[in-house]
Amino acid sequence: MTAKIFSLDEVSKHKTKSDLWVVIHNKVYDITRFVVEHPGGEEVLVDEGGKDATEAFEDIGHSDEAREMLEEYLIGSLDEASRTKEYNVNVIRAGELPEEKKGSSLRIILPALAIIGALVYKYVIVPKAHQ
């Protein structure tokens, strides 16, 4: 089966609850059947209907399961003239959280300042007091 190609103008005609298409990563999805099932409510989908919803989709941070479910609604892709640049998406999946930094520069700066302060006290302030 050859994938259908749609213009953004064609997609924009499908923006109602009873006829809802969205574009995500330059792929066109007919999510009409999913509107009532969407855990975030139908309003958020209708708001993004008929346009490129890539940014909104990625900002929410959908699960792998949601991404897999999306594929069953795929009906084609966006034509070259309508395409947007691909977003650089860094998806954080469960169990793959980025490593937390082990410390900060304060761990070096504060002890260094304490040592400098002690040396100034011992070699500058104390000798002046004994003069």
Curated annotation (Swiss-Prot):
<keyword id="KW-0492">Microsome</keyword>
<protein>
    <recommendedName>
        <fullName>Cytochrome b5</fullName>
    </recommendedName>
</protein>
<keyword id="KW-0813">Transport</keyword>
<keyword id="KW-0349">Heme</keyword>
<comment type="function">
    <text>Membrane bound hemoprotein which function as an electron carrier for several membrane bound oxygenases.</text>
</comment>
<keyword id="KW-0249">Electron transport</keyword>
<dbReference type="GO" id="GO:0046872">
    <property type="term" value="F:metal ion binding"/>
</dbReference>
<dbReference type="InterPro" id="IPR050668">
    <property type="entry name" value="Cytochrome_b5"/>
</dbReference>
<dbReference type="InterPro" id="IPR001199">
    <property type="entry name" value="Cyt_B5-like_heme/steroid-bd"/>
</dbReference>
<feature type="transmembrane region" description="Helical">
    <location>
        <begin position="108"/>
        <end position="125"/>
    </location>
</feature>
<dbReference type="Pfam" id="PF00173">
    <property type="entry name" value="Cyt-b5"/>
</dbReference>
<keyword id="KW-0256">Endoplasmic reticulum</keyword>
<keyword id="KW-0479">Metal-binding</keyword>
<dbReference type="InterPro" id="IPR018506">
    <property type="entry name" value="Cyt_B5_heme-BS"/>
</dbReference>
<keyword id="KW-0472">Membrane</keyword>
<feature type="binding site" description="axial binding residue">
    <location>
        <position position="38"/>
    </location>
    <ligand>
        <name>heme</name>
    </ligand>
</feature>
<keyword id="KW-1133">Transmembrane helix</keyword>
<feature type="binding site" description="axial binding residue">
    <location>
        <position position="62"/>
    </location>
    <ligand>
        <name>heme</name>
    </ligand>
</feature>
<comment type="similarity">
    <text>Belongs to the cytochrome b5 family.</text>
</comment>
<keyword id="KW-0408">Iron</keyword>
<dbReference type="GO" id="GO:0005789">
    <property type="term" value="C:endoplasmic reticulum membrane"/>
</dbReference>
<dbReference type="InterPro" id="IPR036400">
    <property type="entry name" value="Cyt_B5-like_heme/steroid_sf"/>
</dbReference>
<keyword id="KW-0812">Transmembrane</keyword>
<dbReference type="GO" id="GO:0020037">
    <property type="term" value="F:heme binding"/>
</dbReference>
<feature type="domain" description="Cytochrome b5 heme-binding">
    <location>
        <begin position="3"/>
        <end position="79"/>
    </location>
</feature>
